[in-house]
Structures are given as C-alpha cells and as structure tokens.
C-alpha cells in the first residue's frame, strides 16, 4: 500500500512537471539557487574518484544549506545523505564529462543538480528498504537507520521529500542548461524525457523492493547512466546500449554485494543459490560487457578502472 501511495504521488508530480517543461524555451521552472553549488575544477578536466567524491560532497552540503529540505525533515534527510560512497552521482557526472569531450554546444554542462537528483532517489529507496515493513534494519553505514533514529513517520516523509526534491533538481538542471548553454538542443523536451524516464525507473525499483531482487538496485544505475548520456548530448538512438551498460554494471554491483553478504543475508541471495565462485565469475563478466559498451561509445575513461575495482573489492571483501 505504501508503495502504491508513493508511486501515485510521483505520477501526479510528473504530470505537473512535464506540463511546465513544455512552456516557452526561456520560461524558468524553478527558483534560482541563492548560492552556487560548486566552485572549483573545470567540468571538463579529468578527475579521480576521490576528487569527484569531495566535489559532490561540497555540492550536497551547499544544496542542503540552500534549503533543499525544509522544517523537521531537514535533519533526517541530511542524516541519510551524508556518509555515502556517491558512486551514482559520480558515474552521472563522469558520463556527462566524457560525452562533452566528443561534442558540446558552447559552454560545458555542469550536471550538479542531476547528480543530486540521482543520489536523492537512491537514498530515498534505502530509507524505505530499511523500514520495519521491509528489511527491518536498524544499522546502515555503521550508524542508526533513519527510522531507528527519527521514527517511522519521519522516515516515510523523508523518503517522500527526497523523491520530490529529486524531480525539482531535474527541473533545476534544465533551467541551468537554458541559462548557461543557449545552443543546447530543446532543453524543454529533454526535461519531459528525463522526468518520464525517471518515473518509470522508480516504479521498477519499487516493484523490485517489494520482492527483494536486483531490480531494486539496477534502476538507480540506469538513471545515472542514461541521465548522464542524455545531458552530455549523447545520441538518443544509443540510449538502449547505455541502458544495457547500466544493467550490466547494476547486476555486477548487486552480485558483489550478495557475495559480501553471503554469510549474513537472510533473504534472497544469488551467491547462496549459485555459490561464491560462479557469482564472482558473473560479476567479472557483467563488468567486462559494461566496459565493452562504454569503450564502444568512447566514454570509458580512467576513472572507470577505479569504479570497477571498487565493485571487485566488495566481492573480495577487501
């Protein structure tokens, strides 16, 4: 029932947001930021994982201080967001960067708002996943889960706030592109495309959450990969291949996690069913296919070596 309520609210928001993104080209959908989210390295300069992580942490802190969350939900939302690995927003930002090295439309796109959106969606799913009605977990990232610290009601409202703010961030990203990249082709249509795609992905994630399968993990990587590709002005015709790359990476990520949790997981676990050796081989195979696709689209950069190694390290327990 809770899942259906969330999806219903999201669908209503999508209809509203899409209608606004079809207004005249220079009509602003969102209020401008009171502060810039980040001042630092040029968006097209190469970065390693540590640099990207620190950059996104600055973006996140500035967004929270700028009022992305209001009132009594500020503390639980901030609490949930801090301390993550930020792999999804890093993937999104790197794909945008790599795409623009091949082609751009004037000023480089800085995808800070889109990166926030994918992290907000992901963290909202973690809050719900930890709830007593799902996994009933009281610890995550070596600290109390949101519901255990702030109560079930605030946890539910925080997940909703994160989801709704994520869509707001997508709209803010479109406004940013209109303001800074006047040669970008039809940003209004892009906004409608992104909102529709994200709502579909969140629905898939919610369905996977109900039955505890990898489908609760993969959709958030699809959001990161595809939003990065589209914002980086990658070809719409190639979205299917980018989605396949995201599917492979998401599967590898989930299977590595299953190996790590082999001895403690009480729910469905691929490694328990097929064994650690086969599961590790599958992780390697999925990563290899993902790498092949990214190479083919000329967006495989040095940071992917770090990202892939992090997945392998999870599987190895190192």
Swiss-Prot record:
InterPro entries: Isoprenoid_synthase_dom_sf, Polyprenyl_synt
SUPFAM superfamilies in UniProt: Terpenoid synthases
Catalytic activity: isopentenyl diphosphate + dimethylallyl diphosphate = (2E)-geranyl diphosphate + diphosphate; isopentenyl diphosphate + (2E)-geranyl diphosphate = (2E,6E)-farnesyl diphosphate + diphosphate; isopentenyl diphosphate + (2E,6E)-farnesyl diphosphate = (2E,6E,10E)-geranylgeranyl diphosphate + diphosphate; isopentenyl diphosphate + (2E,6E,10E)-geranylgeranyl diphosphate = (2E,6E,10E,14E)-geranylfarnesyl diphosphate + diphosphate
Entry EC no(s): 2.5.1.-, 2.5.1.1, 2.5.1.29, 2.5.1.10
Residues annotated to bind dimethylallyl diphosphate: 140, 216-217, 254
Positions that bind Mg(2+) 2: 129, 135
Membrane topology term: Single-pass membrane protein
Protein localization: Host endoplasmic reticulum; Host membrane
Protein residues bound to isopentenyl diphosphate: 85, 88, 122, 141
Names of required cofactors: Mg(2+)
Induction profile: Expressed in the late phase of the viral replicative cycle.
GO cellular component: a single term: membrane
Root EC class: transferase
Pathway membership: Isoprenoid biosynthesis; farnesyl diphosphate biosynthesis; farnesyl diphosphate from geranyl diphosphate and isopentenyl diphosphate: step 1/1; Isoprenoid biosynthesis; geranyl diphosphate biosynthesis; geranyl diphosphate from dimethylallyl diphosphate and isopentenyl diphosphate: step 1/1; Isoprenoid biosynthesis; geranylgeranyl diphosphate biosynthesis; geranylgeranyl diphosphate from farnesyl diphosphate and isopentenyl diphosphate: step 1/1
GO biological processes: farnesyl diphosphate biosynthetic process; geranyl diphosphate biosynthetic process; geranylgeranyl diphosphate biosynthetic process
An example Gene Ontology molecular-function term: geranylfarnesyl diphosphate synthase activity
TM region positions: 1-21
Binding site for Mg(2+) 1: 129, 135
Database matches in Pfam families: polyprenyl_synt
Entry keyword set: Host endoplasmic reticulum, Host membrane, Isoprene biosynthesis, Late protein, Magnesium, Membrane, Metal-binding, Transferase, Transmembrane, Transmembrane helix
CC cofactor note: Binds 2 Mg(2+) ions per subunit.
Biological function: Trans-prenyltransferase that catalyzes the sequential condensation of isopentenyl diphosphate (IPP) with different allylic diphosphates, such as dimethylallyl diphosphate (DMAPP), geranyl diphosphate (GPP), farnesyl diphosphate (FPP) and geranylgeranyl diphosphate (GGPP), farnesyl diphosphate being the best allylic substrate.
Family under the similarity heading: Belongs to the FPP/GGPP synthase family. Asfivirus trans-prenyltransferase subfamily.
Protein name as annotated: Trans-prenyltransferase
UniProt organism field: African swine fever virus (isolate Warthog/Namibia/Wart80/1980) (ASFV)
């Amino acid at each position: 029932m809770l899942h259906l309520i969330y999806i219903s609210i999201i669908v209503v928001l999508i209809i509203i947001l899409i209608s606004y993104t079809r207004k005249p080209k220079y009509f602003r959908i969102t209020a401008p930021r009171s502060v810039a989210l980040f001042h630092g390295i040029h968006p097209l300069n190469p970065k390693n994982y540590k640099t990207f992580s620190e950059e996104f942490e600055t973006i996140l802190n500035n967004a929270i201080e700028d009022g992305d969350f209001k009132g009594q939900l500020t503390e639980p939302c901030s609490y949930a967001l801090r301390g993550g690995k930020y792999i999804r927003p890093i993937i999104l930002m790197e794909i945008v960067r790599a795409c623009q090295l091949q082609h751009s439309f004037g000023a480089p796109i800085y995808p800070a708002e889109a990166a926030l959106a994918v992290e907000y969606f992901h963290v909202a799913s973690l809050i719900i996943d930890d709830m007593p009605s799902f996994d009933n977990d009281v610890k995550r990232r070596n600290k109390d889960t949101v519901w255990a610290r702030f109560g079930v009601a605030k946890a539910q409202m925080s997940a909703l706030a994160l989801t709704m703010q994520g869509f707001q961030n997508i709209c803010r990203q479109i406004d940013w592109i209109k303001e800074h990249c006047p040669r970008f082709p039809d940003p209004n249509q892009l906004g409608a495309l992104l909102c529709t795609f994200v709502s579909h992905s969140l629905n898939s994630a919610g369905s996977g959450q109900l039955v505890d399968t990898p489908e609760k993990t993969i959709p958030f990587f699809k959001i990161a990969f595809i939003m990065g590709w589209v914002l980086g002005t990658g070809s719409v015709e190639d979205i299917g291949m980018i989605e396949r790359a995201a599917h492979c990476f998401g599967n590898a990520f989930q299977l590595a996690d299953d190996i790590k949790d082999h001895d403690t997981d009480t729910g469905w676990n691929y490694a328990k069913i097929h064994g650690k050796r086969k599961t590790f081989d599958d992780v390697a195979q999925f990563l290899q296919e993902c790498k092949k696709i990214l190479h083919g689209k000329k967006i495989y950069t040095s940071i992917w070596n770090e990202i892939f190694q992090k997945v392998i390290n999870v599987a190895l327990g190192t």
